[in-house]
């Protein structure tokens, strides 16, 4: 019984630490790391849709909701219809492995994901600084 209690406590601590690490990304590093995303996504004033939608204000935005982007996959549209929102945790999962979330997404086919949790946290921290336009 004691082993299970210790395991449970360790699991809670690990979850708390991972959430803290996610929230504490470095925006400067994130801006540099976003170059990988910039092949398909733009941010900032005048951002356009390229291979993927522009990402202004993406944190907190409903999935598949950029009006002038027409290449959403069926899976992404379904998420949007279900009210799925791009919060930090969902963005982290998506950037880590798009194919695991939505196999039919163009991003899942073209981008393998970023395995490094710190780099993902940095990108998300940077995206949080970009307001909707």
Regions found by a protein language model. Give the residues of each.
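Thiol/disulfide oxidoreductase modules built on the thioredoxin-like
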Residues: 103, 108-114
């Amino acid at each position: 019984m004691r082993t299970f209690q210790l395991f449970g406590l360790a699991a809670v601590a690990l979850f708390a630490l991972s959430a803290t690490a996610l929230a504490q990304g470095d925006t400067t590093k994130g801006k540099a790391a976003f170059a990988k995303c910039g092949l398909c996504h733009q941010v900032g004033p005048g951002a356009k849709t390229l291979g993927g939608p522009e990402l202004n204000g993406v944190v907190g935005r409903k999935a598949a909701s950029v009006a002038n982007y027409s290449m959403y996959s069926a899976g992404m549209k379904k998420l949007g219809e279900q009210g799925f929102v791009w919060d930090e945790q969902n963005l982290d999962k998506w950037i880590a492995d798009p194919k695991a979330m939505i196999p039919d997404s163009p991003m899942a086919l073209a981008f393998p994901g970023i395995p490094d949790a710190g780099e993902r946290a940095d990108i998300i921290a940077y995206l949080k600084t970009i307001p909707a336009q």
